[in-house]
Structures are given as C-alpha cells and as structure tokens.
UniProtKB/Swiss-Prot annotation:
Its cofactor is Ni(2+). It comes from Rhizobium etli (strain ATCC 51251 / DSM 11541 / JCM 21823 / NBRC 15573 / CFN 42). This is Ureidoglycolate lyase. InterPro entries: RmlC_Cupin_sf, UAH_cupin, Ureidogly_lyase, Ureidogly_lyase_bac, Ureidoglycolate_lyase_dom_sf. Catalyzes the catabolism of the allantoin degradation intermediate (S)-ureidoglycolate, generating urea and glyoxylate. Involved in the utilization of allantoin as nitrogen source. GO terms for biological process: allantoin catabolic process; purine nucleobase catabolic process.
C-alpha cells in the first residue's frame, strides 16, 4: 500500500528547517529610488562553497507534473544553496526531507503560491522542480564551480502525492 503525503501551505515557520521562503515581507521592506520602489531586503542568503565557486542566476522552465505523482527520489547540493522563484506567477509544489543519517527521511510537501519562492540551504534534501498545471518559468539562483554539487537518493518504495486541490 503506498504512503500518501499531505500537502501543506508554504509558511516561513514550517519551511525554516530547510531554508527560507522568498516573499514580500513587510518587516524587510525599505523604500528606495526616491520612494518609488519597495525593496524587500535580504529575504534569503545564497551559499557557494568550494574551488572556483560563484553564485549564478538561471532560468528553469518546468513542465507540469501529472498526479498522483510518485516521489521516488530526492537530491541535495553539498556545495551550495538553490533558490526557485516563479516568474510565471503560477503555484508549484516544494518537496523536502530532513537528513536521517546521510539519507532523506519521509518527504514533506508544501504548496507554494505563485508569489512565493524558496531557497534550499546547502545540503537540504529536496525533490526536483514540480510545476503545476502548465509549463512555468523560474528564476533559479545557485552555485557554479568545480566539484560534484549533486547527490541523489532513490527510495525503495516511492511516496505518493495526490493531485493538489485547486
């Protein structure tokens, strides 16, 4: 019998063990440019470690997932953080796991609104990008440099995500 995963709303407090939620936070807002622009300052910290490491900005185009969806693998990046911010304004799913002795534990699933992004801290187990509904573009900030910055883990028995409620 498959183990189904519940989908929870993405909140700063629930996501805190894994990284930061990127969203307009009134507490971090500063007016700049003569008062014509609101800057939401330092919402997440990019990490880039290792030889020749640098922070880069990418555009990812995610294809929508079909449901029910089997979560059969997780990945992590030992040398850098990785952030995803939707620029298509569409929601997406965020799947993360706590580390349990060098492997991912039971995944947790969060529903991110189209105005929320996430920053996975270095070494956080997460599932690859999960766009919903239609092809979606994401601004991705992560690390470039020498060394293998990808570790993958495949579950013997996948976990299952039911279709998210509209």
């Amino acid at each position: 019998m498959p183990e189904f995963l519940d989908i929870r709303p993405l909140t700063r407090s629930a996501f805190a063990p894994f990284g930061e939620v990127i969203e307009a936070d009134p507490a971090s807002m500063r007016l700049i440019n003569g008062g014509t622009t609101e800057r939401f300052h330092a919402l997440a910290a990019a990490e880039a470690a290792g030889e020749g490491a640098r922070v880069i900005i990418n555009l990812f185009r995610g294809q929508p997932r079909s449901f029910p969806y089997d979560v059969d693998m997780m990945e992590r990046h030992p040398f850098g953080s990785q952030s995803f911010s939707p620029i298509s304004g569409r929601p997406f799913l965020v799947v993360v796991s706590e580390d349990e002795g060098g492997r991912p534990g039971k995944p947790q699933v969060f529903f991110a609104r189209g105005d929320q992004g996430v920053n996975y801290r270095r070494n956080v187990w997460h599932h690859p990008l999960m766009a919903l509904g239609q092809t979606s573009d994401f601004l991705v900030v992560d690390r470039d440099g020498l060394g293998n910055n990808l570790e993958e883990f495949f579950f013997e028995t996948p976990f299952v995500i039911k279709e998210p409620a509209p």
